[in-house]
Swiss-Prot record:
One of its GO terms (biological process) is mismatch repair. This is DNA mismatch repair protein MutS. GO terms for cellular component: cytosol. ATP binds at G602, P603, N604, M605, S606, G607, K608, S609. GO terms for molecular function: ATP binding; ATP-dependent DNA damage sensor activity; damaged DNA binding; mismatched DNA binding. Belongs to the DNA mismatch repair MutS family. InterPro entries: DNA_mismatch_repair_MutS, DNA_mismatch_repair_MutS-lik_N, DNA_mismatch_repair_MutS/MSH, DNA_mismatch_repair_MutS_C, DNA_mismatch_repair_MutS_clamp, DNA_mismatch_repair_MutS_core, DNA_mismatch_repair_MutS_N, DNA_mismatch_repair_MutS_sf. Signal peptide: none annotated. Keywords: ATP-binding, DNA damage, DNA repair, DNA-binding, Nucleotide-binding.
């Protein structure tokens, strides 16, 4: 990639850049990282930094932009957040000692999925995902390079892959198989991530268990290869690969988690107002991340849930000890990410001090846990390794006032190394020795204004003015002559100066070497530190759940095998927290073993959606091991939650509200089991009234007859309430209202039976619509109700079957016609649920041509 008339330094830049064409190359030159050519032009615009040029007077000056080395991280963060890659080229030798061009090499490539530096201590996991396909199944592997966590699973279809990527909130995905450009574009737009291809797998890694499926191994190997290619060093903090099965956790799509505000408020994108916000009383960054993981993946086995419940109960029963435990955890730093900084060779003295400070607290934390005297805590207590030898090393080696950088000195504590102590003594006492020499020579020479000065060129010297030159002693030797004075030295002064300079240089070099050795020793403890981090994070989350349970008067839920739901005076935990206990109206929820569907009717704003979400959050809280917002609760264990709550177009995919509704309904009824929970709110409203009602009825019947999942179905189609006479496992409930003197009060209380009215006009009145408009609406409503009284809107199950048979007979009349046969074949090949509106129009046009 040589260019004519470029300097050797620029040729070096071009040679390196050709290996990293898709990354911004930050090229270290002295105290700056420079960018050139197109990188400089783009970076100047993105980072809002000055754009200049190299060789300004040349015919084709080279665009150039730069950032100071000490603030480079903030600029890297901006580029990474925008989805770019950044390659860091460092100087590999001292420029003062270099012969010719300073040797430079890329030491790291930072990408959205491998970024580890963050100014936020509470920042969530940053997962890099790799996906492979063997023609039958997909292998998916993911890693957080900042913590070393490493996982893999296999999935049956690409829809599951996309869902898992969304749930992980991955910023970068590696594909190990070919994907069309159209599919790539859709994936990038839908998931808002950086997509790369990685076809080379790292084989025979000790981190990978070869008992995994071949496609999992391939995905994990390709992920590891990419990490090694970008980080360009051995990473000792990477943990052994853990296989997981999505069926081991309560399955929820990203849309479901979003609609339930599990990790963030869907309307604001903030933590406040989410279940995570409610449950977070953690004291450590590790605990915060683990709590997010628990909320994201609730359990499905009672043994693991009960184990968590027992520990929460132990903490609840001992307020003083739990408070002491919480206070002690406040001083625990992020061991996981400190370990990764050690592994990356980036840990500074402050990092080691934080690690040492944490280790100093661990014995006391362990003692507190032992003081609970509970067998349920034995497992956790045994996992807490106090690492006394590492704590002693850091405490005895690192000065408590050490700076954040490793080149400022004053890192190593006095008394740790004899040579270093000697050099420091020379530097400390050398100043006094020089003062003594100055006093002695002033008295001996009789030169009253004789003094010793220092500069980099001449070192230490005696300053003698011209008027006193005749009094200069014989053992003085001239070092420099100035206009009005001369500079002299002596053998004694030179000796002391030599000792001080040697001490300064040797001290700096020795202190750096000692710190590197200590950091290398710390690295040997990374495995034990990571195990300690997991144990402390678990303790932190469990104490957090205990604190939340006590503050909010939650109860311990029970689990039953009778497939019944019995929640007495339950509350929507998040809404209650926002409104306050006094304002919130609780609701009991009951599903008997023979009840599978609650059909919920009632006006808008009355609380139907809150009631449905209340059940979902209660289930999720129970299955992460938390206590729940109710007076009592008995639940079955659910394997999945499916929701359709709220309406919105998917503009990126070109899908309308109704199409999204139907796709989510299809996803639910095809994947749900009798152990699942389905929440459908106003399904069918995105199309014409009778179309919507017909679909709603058919979906309810399908769930009732074929799926058997516990289902809440909220609707404004009051005609559907008649289904309770035909479907034995369906019950009607409604949101109670109080109507008096023309005024309507929503009681936000669930009652048995169907609602008698929708009160839509009353809601419109609350919204402030003009009274004359509302009066006209009342007139129209009365007329429409009169017209529909004689008409039965819900077909019986028998009528549905007869109608279907008639449709089949009518269709068979045309089977001998060639064009009809072609139309049927074309229709059978169409994947209706995955059509965009534009694609649907194209299909209709093709069918029309066949007529």
């Amino acid at each position: 990639m040589a260019k004519a008339n470029v300097s050797p330094g620029m040729q070096q830049y071009l040679d390196i850049k050709k290996d990293y064409p898709d990354a911004f190359l930050l090229f270290r030159m002295g105290d700056f990282y420079e960018l050139f050519y197109e990188d400089a032009v783009k970076a100047a615009q993105i980072l809002e930094i000055g754009l200049t040029s190299r060789n300004k007077n040349a015919d084709n000056p080279i665009p150039m932009a730069g950032v100071p080395y000490h603030s480079v991280q903030q600029y890297i963060d901006v580029l990474i957040d925008l989805g770019h890659k950044v390659a860091i080229a460092e100087q590999m030798e001292d420029p003062k000692q270099a012969v010719g061009v300073v040797k430079r090499e890329v030491v790291q490539v930072i990408t959205p999925g491998t970024a580890v530096d963050s100014s936020r201590p509470d920042s969530p996991n940053n997962f890099l995902v790799a996906v492979d396909f063997d023609g039958k199944a997909y292998g998916l592997s993911y890693m957080d390079v900042s913590t070393g966590e490493f996982f893999a699973t296999d999935l049956a279809d690409f829809a599951s892959v996309k869902s898992e990527i969304q749930n992980l909130k991955a910023k970068e995905v590696l594909l190990g198989f070919e994907l069309s450009e159209e599919e790539q574009a859709i994936l990038v737009k839908q998931l808002n991530l950086l997509l790369s291809f990685e076809m080379t797998a790292l084989e025979d890694s000790p981190l990978i268990d070869h008992q995994l499926t071949a496609v999992e191994l391939s995905a994990a190997g390709k992920l590891l290869h990419y990490v090694h290619q970008t980080q360009l060093r051995e990473l000792s903090h990477l943990q052994a690969l853990v296989h997981y099965d999505i069926k081991d956790y309560l399955q929820m799509s990203y849309a479901t988690k979003s609609s339930l505000d599990l990790l963030e408020n869907a309307r604001t994108g903030k933590k406040h107002g989410s279940l995570y916000w409610l449950l977070d009383e953690t004291k450590t960054a590790m605990g915060m991340r683990l709590l997010r993981a628990w909320i994201d993946r609730p359990l499905v086995t009672s043994e693991a849930i009960l184990e968590r419940q027992e520990i929460i109960q132990v903490f609840l029963n001992a307020f003083i000890e739990r408070t002491d435990l919480s206070d002690s955890l406040k001083g625990v730093y992020d061991i996981e990410r400190l370990s990764s900084r050690v592994s990356f060779g980036k840990a500074n003295p402050k990092d080691l001090l934080q690690l040492g400070h944490t280790l100093a607290k661990v014995p006391y934390i362990k003692a507190i846990l032992e003081a609970f005297n509970s067998p349920y805590l034995d497992k956790l207590v045994n996992q807490i390794d106090t690492l006394p030898e590492l704590e002693h090393l850091i405490r005895s080696a690192i000065d408590p006032d050490a700076p954040a950088t490793i080149n400022e000195g004053n890192i190593i504590r006095t008394g740790f190394d004899e040579r270093l102590d000697h050099y420091r003594k020379v530097m400390r006492e050398g100043t006094g020795w020089i003062a003594d020499i100055e006093t002695k020579e002033r008295q001996a020479s009789g030169i009253s204004n004789l003094k010793i000065d220092y500069n980099k060129k001449d070192g230490y010297y005696f300053h003698v003015t011209n008027s006193n030159l005749g009094m200069v002693p014989d053992h003085f030797f001239r070092k420099a002559t100035l206009k009005n004075s001369e500079r002299y030295g002596t053998a004694e002064l030179a000796k002391i100066e030599g000792q001080m300079l040697e001490a300064r240089e040797e001290s700096s070099s020795l202190e750096y070497d000692i710190f590197m050795r200590i950091r290398a020793q710390v690295e040997t403890y990374i495995d034990r530190l990571q195990q300690l981090a997991k144990a402390l994070a678990t303790v932190d989350v469990l104490q957090s759940l205990a604190v939340v349970a006590e503050k909010n008067h939650y109860v311990r839920p029970l689990f039953n095998q009778e497939s019944k739901i019995a929640i007495d005076n339950g509350r929507h935990a998040v809404v209650e927290k926002v409104l306050g206990v006094q304002e919130y109206i609780p609701n009991s929820i009951s599903f008997g073993p023979q009840t599978s569907i609650q059909l919920i009717t009632g006006p808008n704003m009355s609380g139907k959606s809150t009631y449905m979400r209340q059940l979902a959050l209660t289930v999720i809280m129970a299955q992460i091991g938390s206590f729940v917002a109710a007076e009592s609760a008995s639940l079955p264990l659910f394997d999945a939650i499916f929701t359709r709550i709220g309406a919105a177009d998917d503009l990126i995919s070109g899908q309308s509200t109704f199409m999204v509704e139907m796709m989510e309904a299809n996803h639910a009824i095809k994947r749900a089991t009798p152990h699942s929970l389905i929440l459908f709110d106003e399904l069918g409203r995105g199309t014409a009234t009778y179309d919507g009602m017909a679909l709603a009825q058919s979906i309810i019947e399908y769930i009732h007859d074929r799926v058997g999942a516990k289902t809440m179905f909220a609707t404004h189609y009051h005609e559907l309430t008649e289904l309770s006479t035909k479907l034995t496992k369906l019950v009607n409930v409604h949101v109670a209202t109080l109507e008096k003197d023309g005024n309507v009060t929503f009681l936000h209380k669930i009652a048995e039976g169907p609602a008698d009215k929708s009160y839509g006009i009353h809601v419109a009145r609350i919204a402030g619509l003009p009274e004359d408009l509302l009066a006209r609406a009342d007139t129209v409503l009365t007329k429409l109700e009169a017209q529909s009284q004689a008409r039965e809107s819900v077909l019986s199950t028998t009528e549905v079957r007869e109608t279907q048979q008639l449709a089949n007979q009518q269709l068979s009349l045309f089977t001998d016609d060639g064009s009809s046969s072609e139309i049927i074949k074309r229709l059978e090949s169409v994947d209706v649920m995955n059509l965009t509106p534009i694609q649907a129009m194209t299909v209709l046009y093709e069918l029309k041509k066949l007529l």
